[in-house]
Amino acid sequence: MQATSVDRNIRFLVIELFWAAIASAAYSFAAAYVIRLGGSNFIVSLITSAAAVVNMVTTIPFAALMERTANRRPWLFRSLITFRLMHIGLIFVPFLPYWRAEAVVVILLLANIPVAIFNTVWLPMFADIIPIQRRARLFSARNVTLGATMMVATYGFGRWLESDANAFPGNYQILFCIALIMSMLSTWYVTRMDIPDSPIDPAAHVDRSLAGMWKLFTENKAYSSITINTLILNIAPWAAIALQPIYFVRVLHASDEWLGIWFAITNGGAILGNLFWPRLMEKYGFYRIMTIAAVISCTYFFAIGFVPNLTAILVFSLFIGMINPGIDIAHFNILLQVCSPQRRALALGIFVTVMNFGLMVSSLIVSPMIDLIGPQALVIGLGVLRLVGGLLFVVNPVVRSETHLMQTAE
């Protein structure tokens, strides 16, 4: 792409995320919303697992469709708008006489159908519109925007929700109205981006059967390694999505205001991390930095498990917020590079499906594991799994050298 188009896209990718971050900050209280609607631990875990089921079932068919579709822009825009409009249902849930917590799960379940379409276009799109030399800086800018905005918004929303707890559910309904408006502003900027047709080879015979997808997975050692390693690495944070609201609210008795502070501090740490990780990646390479950060990240789970104190957890959250960008920025760049341009849509579709399977299983086991060993022991166990996942990138390396990574798939 021309430099002017790249610059324009980078600008819009940062601006749209500002508005999307405000919406995300509001929706981050969805688990607390379900708990206050009377949802059980199992219902809270379904918020994550239901979305994972939909994405797991639909991503590969949509990715196969996108692999043979050069003009993916209409699919991108329409799926994004549909997804965001479907969140209107959250506003009206309190008017239901029964099954209100369950209704939230149903809404999020259905909303993830357009998300699956969106992701099959959005993820490979970055490789098409942003040169690899500029991706780390772009992802850093997006992450800083996301972190700074969510830090302020989550803290403000948490304080506001806590200021008049008796206003429930009206305060949450207003919160989701704000989220809807902000998400529409984000969508408008996405529609202004310059997105070229994706590379396809219409003359090539592509086997999209299960056997063909298995061959795609096994023939590329780097691709299969990053998929397996990432699956194990992410079990802990996936389970934590459902576990942390239960652990913080029901066990440690965290308030809405504390949750807002926690979200804000975690995102504040991400801002700091995004300021220094890209420079280290330019000096030492994506893979080395990702591996180091992945191993270090296990300390968060050990810390909040062995020190169940809400004030101390805020300090630990600042730390993990700083560490996570070192994993996320490097990992996405590596993943894009190990997938060939012509097969990138389907390869990423398979990757996302495997990850959603892990997300679903990780979320569903939270409730029975809490009943079996208790939330505190479960948090510590997740720390062990996170450590194992980080070490896999050492014993089962994705690439042998940074030079090989930069040459891959280009």
Give the positions of each predicted feature.
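Juxtamembrane intracellular "pre-TM" segments in multi-pass secondary transporters
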Residues: M1-V6, P196-I228, E410
